[in-house]
Amino acid sequence: MSKIIAFDEEARRGLERGMNQLADAVKVTLGPKGRNVVLEKKWGAPTITNDGVSIAKEIELEDPYEKIGAELVKEVAKKTDDVAGDGTTTATVLAQALVREGLRNVAAGANPMGLKRGIEKAVEAVTEQLLGAAKEVTTKEQIAATAGISAGDASIGELIAEALDKVGKEGVITVEESNTFGLELELTEGMRFDKGYISPYFVTDAERQETELEDPYILILNSKISTVKDLLPLLEKVMQSGKPLVIVAEDVEGEALATLVVNKIRGTFKSVAVKAPGFGDRRKAMLGDIAILTGGQVISEEVGLKLDTADLDLLGRARKVVVTKDETTIVEGAGDADAIAGRVGQIRAEIERSDSDYDREKLQERLAKLAGGVAVIKAGAATEVELKERKHRIEDAVRNAKAAVEEGIVAGGGVALIQAGVLAFEKLELVGDEATGANIVKVAIEAPLKQIAINAGLEGGVVAEKVRNLPTGHGLNAATGEYVDLLGAGINDPVKVTRSALQNAASIAALFLTTEAVIADKPEKAAAAPAGGDGGMGGMDF
């Protein structure tokens, strides 16, 4: 495919036009009085959202240079969403302000590389101030306030705070669609995985169709069990102990399964067989997790352990195991706390190293099952469009709350950036183009607050000037139009969100300013429609 090339000012202005179109569509959603954006879908009902990254993803521009500019800003929103789960609109507004101010200075003759260095130093100084000013999140109310602001709904904030309180910061909170109207929270006690009993004959509670075994031994096996002779020596030892047995294996079939079922029906011996969760390497890892949690070992020929020679000390223990037809829950495994902590550290290191979103998600689930627990928020709404929008808001708010617990909170509403900037720029001593670069940041960090004010029907410049001179932590409550102590009023943002938004916006802005040429695909002319005539069927009716 042939290419087109633009140089110098033409290249940068083309990128800026694309960025402005995307940013202008996104920034109307910022703040408590921000509006929604309707996104048309190729199939199904349109989506209504106020989430910056969702809007950005939908924007495809026709002009090749504008398209590249928009794609670069999409990257800001996506990266901020990946890291912090929120702040995508703030990041987009900051990127637009940094680029606008930066290009003005480049056009006036400033050296782009000098500006880039100045921007980087200023952002580092502001980030340092933000982290220094962050308040640790210690109460449920603080989490509820943060999540409530992100979701735009205090009741969602309270539910998320309740969920985090139960499962801990390592726990997993998932959001599911509900058939009923409103919100509900469902908590999982212990480790749960999505495999149920192999045979319904194992059921101990016919009414609830589940098997519940108290204080069982747990056999964890990385292979199939088909013949009873392999299992018999271990079965006899477990029967002598008087405890029930849970078998987690690749599969249990044939006479081995028949023997277990017959003994269960006769009341001789209580047991349940469950297929191991996952596939391939992930199955191995999850069996290892179950072994660590219950204080047992995975019986596998790879490590020289065989079923027919296994002893009771290789089996795991738990206070209770509950098995339904679809899932298994292990409550209070008897694993060593240090071993579990070591395994958690190992999984966390894998998450850091992984560059696949899918792998990261699966590792996060494993981490939650070991370290915390799982909470499910079920959301319902009147229409499918509203339900999707609500579910998305809750997912964002969950990540926002976790970010708050991780690094702490700062005053919300765009105020923290301005007030951190006031302190940072007092200490910053730069000259020449680097000083100009720092000044670009000084002007740009006011953009989120100004946009929040504009969306609330106020004059952005007047509000920014007033906030700059207020005591630290005081600012505009855009919902009421009053100037208050924001942290005291529960208006806060996770510092991770604010910091990520600024750092990612500055990174893309520096790319814009130092661009001297843009090479894009030449737009293809649409092929003319074939004319109808005698040779074809163009003139015929069907």
UniProtKB/Swiss-Prot annotation:
Matching CDD domains: GroEL
Keywords of the record, alphabetical order, are:
ATP-binding, Chaperone, Cytoplasm, Isomerase, Nucleotide-binding
Catalytic activity, EC: 5.6.1.7
Database matches in InterPro entries: Chaperonin_Cpn60_CS, Cpn60/GroEL, Cpn60/GroEL/TCP-1, GroEL-like_apical_dom_sf, GROEL-like_equatorial_sf, TCP-1-like_intermed_sf
Binding-site residues for ATP, renumbered to this chain: T29, L30, G31, P32, D86, G87, T88, T89, T90, G413, N477, A478, A479, D493
Which SUPFAM superfamilies does this UniProt record tie to the protein?
Answer: GroEL apical domain-like, GroEL equatorial domain-like, GroEL-intermediate domain like
The top EC class is: isomerase
Gene Ontology terms: cellular component? cytoplasm
Catalysed conversion reaction: ATP + H2O + a folded polypeptide = ADP + phosphate + an unfolded polypeptide
Q: What processes in GO biological process is this protein linked to?
A: protein refolding
- Location(s), subcellular: Cytoplasm
Molecular functions (GO terms) = ATP binding; ATP-dependent protein folding chaperone; isomerase activity; unfolded protein binding
Task: Please give the PANTHER family that the UniProt record associates with this protein.
Answer: 60 KDA HEAT SHOCK PROTEIN, MITOCHONDRIAL (PTHR45633)
According to its UniProt entry, what is the function of this protein? Answer: Together with its co-chaperonin GroES, plays an essential role in assisting protein folding. The GroEL-GroES system forms a nano-cage that allows encapsulation of the non-native substrate proteins and provides a physical environment optimized to promote and accelerate protein folding.
> What family does the entry list?
Belongs to the chaperonin (HSP60) family.
How it assembles, according to the record, is:
Forms a cylinder of 14 subunits composed of two heptameric rings stacked back-to-back. Interacts with the co-chaperonin GroES.
Q: What is this protein called?
A: Chaperonin GroEL 2
Q: What gene is behind this protein?
A: groEL2
